[in-house]
Amino acid sequence: MMKIQNDIYTGAQNRKSLIDLEIPEEFNGEIIIFIHGFMGFKDWGAWHLVMDYFVQKGYGFCKFNISHGGGTVENGIDFPDPDSFGNNTFSHELEDLNQVVRWIDEKVSHWKGHVIGHSKGGAIALIGGEKIEQVHSISTWAAIASIGERFPKGAQLEKWKSNGVKYVKNGRTQQELPQKYTLYTDYMTNEHTFDLERICGTIDKPIFVAHGEKDTSVDINNGNRLANWSRTNLCVIDKTDHVFDSRHPWTQTELPNPLLQLCKSTEKFLKELK
């Protein structure tokens, strides 16, 4: 048994961020690595209860803050360091995942990994899962189906290029968070690597795709596309939103029912791999 909370790993550009790992007494040798989404963090909402769910089922569970998500090692919640948020790229997030795997390797021997990515984290789960040998399966929760489609087009893209930065508002904190144009140039430089359709169509690892029926942040069509490319069935969680009825902060002691159903469906997928 092992429980590590708010330890520090070194991610992209040697930036330090917070990480949790729990290994249960009855460990089945498999560790789930959870990747949060855009403007998220490891302790958002009910993610701690997701961790508890899988640990109780015998899985190890690791959740971490991406290195350039706006958090610090002193404060991993919300966005106390907007400059780091502005410097984020998909390559940074991919490097973070690689470093997290190495960090786990230093703590645990002979483990098999599974990645779960929420929203934008689902894209990182697919990109990283394609090449990281310790990853044996990929689960996407309310994930985007394309990185390129999320960028502005036309005059808005030219304005971003000209200014070098644009701003996105966090509805909960009301912060105007910067995004540098390097986010886009990093994508264009690595467009083949970041092509989710290509990954889903060629990867030889099992993929589980789930989406909330009433998701207004990332439309369910994204889930349909990922499932079709992966030649698998989409797991639709009925009558729920992008975060499966969870909110931040989450003060209840139990998972919201849609998120519980998602955990059960994901666990069923993982069990069937054995």
Where are the predicted features?
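Short beta-strand/loop motif that positions the catalytic acidic residue
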Residues: 202-203, 209-211, 215
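Hydrolase active-site cap/lid region
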Residues: 131-182
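Short alpha-helix in the alpha/beta-hydrolase fold that links the catalytic acid
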Residues: 47, 205, 218-228
